[in-house]
Amino acid sequence: MYRCPSLLELRELSLCEALLKLDQRNFHCWNHWMLICNMMNVSTEERLAFTMKRIEENPSNYSAWHFRCELINKTITETNAESVLKEGGSTLLHSCVELDLNLNGLYTECDDQSAWYYLRSLVYLIVKFVKSGVLAKEKGVALISNELEALAELEEAAPDCIYLTDFKTEIEHLLHAIEWTVS
């Protein structure tokens, strides 16, 4: 059922957005923004667009990356499992787009922790959905393997990157964890 947002809710949302322009990492404001979005039934697409705008303004905005991952987790969790498994399904395609977006962030500033932690979150989501049967094991292995190949290329371009070795090792362990998952 649709309900028209109140003027107070619209004002709160506008205030949150103004405050986040001033202090992009203010997680208290981000939490309040999410609460208001939930109350107003703001679509996931609109929320993802908002987080993308904040990331474009500041790729080091850890809060924007974090809330983007929360939204993706929510989207996939609420999506019908069959549509996720469907070849070329929009949710699976969205996961690939997110991984590409993240890779761009890593190439832009490989010593910034925000994109690395977002990558970790995305890989953990892939593992979670493979283990729960929402995502086919082969698809999960392919997604993670592609990321490891991209990280190997990044390693050649930026051998002194401080986070690369640790995250690459962790992602390799996660890949092995789902390779051993019984289908």
Where do the PLM segments sit?
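Structured C-terminal portions of repeat-based eukaryotic scaffold domains
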Residues: 74-183
